[in-house]
Structures are given as C-alpha cells and as structure tokens.
Amino acid sequence: MIRIHCKKLHPEARLPKYATEGAAGMDISACLDEPISVEAQSVALVPTGLALEIPPGYEAQLRPRSGLALKHLISLPNAPATIDADFRGELKVILINHGKDAFEVKHGDRIAQMVIAKVEKVAVVEVAALSETKRGEGGFGHTGVEG
C-alpha cells in the first residue's frame, strides 16, 4: 500500500476516507466557513482545506459521486480531474450543476471521490507515417454504426 501525505490547511478539514472496505475511491469533503450555492447550469470551485503529497509516478483523480449525480445532477465537468504528484496547493473541486435548481454545498459534505492511479511516462516519437489498422481514421461513433 502506498502512502499519500495529507496536510490540513484548515483545522476543520476532513481527511480523505474510504467509505467501505471495497471502495476504489476515497470521499473528499468540502471545507467551508459558510455554504456555497451552485446555481443551476453553473459551476463553483469548492475548497477542501487539504493539500496532498502524491508519490512520483502516481496521480490523484477526482471523480463525481454517483449519488450527487443521480439525485441532484451535480458532477465534475473535468472528470476525472488530475492532481499531479508535484502539486502542493489546496485541493479544490470544480462542481457543475446540470439541474434546474440551485444546490447548496455545506461544510463536511462529501463532494467527490479521489482515486490514486499509477502514471506511466512515455516518449513521444515523431514519425512520417503510422501503421495501418482496420479502423483507420474512423472516429466519433464510427464503431457504433452498423453497416
């Protein structure tokens, strides 16, 4: 098991926590002095009061919570959001409200999930041509069309 160092930037911040033994993601909670309203069809940047030290070769991915998406149409517009190993600032979550009504985020609300993932570095090699495949340049729904 790898270790992620986590620094509380606010005394009331809540450390990331797995809700169940089999959970892939840790719950991330809002750290607020007062509630934030995410207006309908708008976004809000929600602080967590936490900073992370992720080991080299890993990233943290922030993902939506399924219950917020299902019940309130609250999601993350850049999911999965990548937190790089060399970032040391406050972890903040961009929430988007796809619903028709404003959504209130209160201190301690679980607003996202965080998954730690291994990252492989690659070398980009410029070439004059690419190898041929059956699919070729077909994209954007190409494989979903019956012909």
UniProtKB/Swiss-Prot annotation:
PANTHER family per the UniProt record, alphabetical: DEOXYURIDINE 5'-TRIPHOSPHATE NUCLEOTIDOHYDROLASE
Gene name of the record: dut
GO biological process: dUMP biosynthetic process; dUTP catabolic process
Cofactor: Mg(2+)
Name listed for the protein in its UniProt record: Deoxyuridine 5'-triphosphate nucleotidohydrolase
Binding residue positions for substrate: R65, S66, G67, N78, T82, I83, D84, K92
SUPFAM superfamilies recorded: dUTPase-like
Organism: Chloroherpeton thalassium (strain ATCC 35110 / GB-78)
Record EC number: 3.6.1.23
One Pfam match: dUTPase
Catalytic activities: dUTP + H2O = dUMP + diphosphate + H(+)
